[in-house]
């Protein structure tokens, strides 16, 4: 048996090929799985459970079927932090705290989306702090659907433009932030996404940091079992 970790699918109505690839993954890769963890940014944007698009509702039904066979866990990302209990319930997903520790076959491991580790990106961290406030989230939820969608589109556009001007270092995790989280959680193994740079990093003091990749051009899945770990790519099946 094995536990699977994915993240950064960025599903949207504009990229239904990714949704189709994810659906195939759910159909074919979970037979021997103990659990599925989705480490944030399942959707490209999420402005509220009351504005779920048809493709997202269909996906919720699929995930609900999966959840009847094995637990499905979800950690919010920077694109879908407004995903709430209503959609999670419909999808059979259990929402976890943004930093969660678990025992993986005898190994204490900390899992998270990963954006909190990119501490050199000061502008984003200020936005992240604001959006984490309960009052800010409540006020945003009180806005009309059209206004929320407009704000989300503007933020996404600004983020894309800003990221193109940021250096590789600023966009990656900051080593001191990684060390601090290891110390805070008393763990030596970490799994996260967000950076879209899949890799297995062997660090000092026997620590290990694993980054799951995005699903823009191919799938990325981390499999963890008692026998070891496997970070693999899943090619998309392109139809003509």
UniProtKB/Swiss-Prot annotation:
It comes from the Bacteria. Mn(2+) 2 binds at residues 41, 78, 113, 194. InterPro entries: Calcineurin-like_PHP_ApaH, LpxH-like, Metallo-depent_PP-like, UDP-diacylglucosamine_Hdrlase. Its main location: membrane. It catalyses: UDP-2-N,3-O-bis[(3R)-3-hydroxytetradecanoyl]-alpha-D-glucosamine + H2O = 2-N,3-O-bis[(3R)-3-hydroxytetradecanoyl]-alpha-D-glucosaminyl 1-phosphate + UMP + 2 H(+). Pathway: Glycolipid biosynthesis; lipid IV(A) biosynthesis; lipid IV(A) from (3R)-3-hydroxytetradecanoyl-[acyl-carrier-protein] and UDP-N-acetyl-alpha-D-glucosamine: step 4/6. It is found in: Cell inner membrane. Substrate binds at residues 78-79, 121, 159, 163, 166, 194. Its cofactor is Mn(2+). GO terms for cellular component: cytoplasm; extrinsic component of plasma membrane. GO terms for biological process: lipid A biosynthetic process. GO terms for molecular function: manganese ion binding; UDP-2,3-diacylglucosamine hydrolase activity. It is a peripheral membrane protein. Mn(2+) 1 binds at residues 8, 10, 41, 196. Keywords: Cell inner membrane, Cell membrane, Hydrolase, Lipid A biosynthesis, Lipid biosynthesis, Lipid metabolism, Manganese, Membrane, Metal-binding. Binds 2 Mn(2+) ions per subunit in a binuclear metal center. Its EC number is 3.6.1.54. It holds the Pfam family Metallophos. Hydrolyzes the pyrophosphate bond of UDP-2,3-diacylglucosamine to yield 2,3-diacylglucosamine 1-phosphate (lipid X) and UMP by catalyzing the attack of water at the alpha-P atom. Involved in the biosynthesis of lipid A, a phosphorylated glycolipid that anchors the lipopolysaccharide to the outer membrane of the cell. Belongs to the LpxH family. This is UDP-2,3-diacylglucosamine hydrolase.
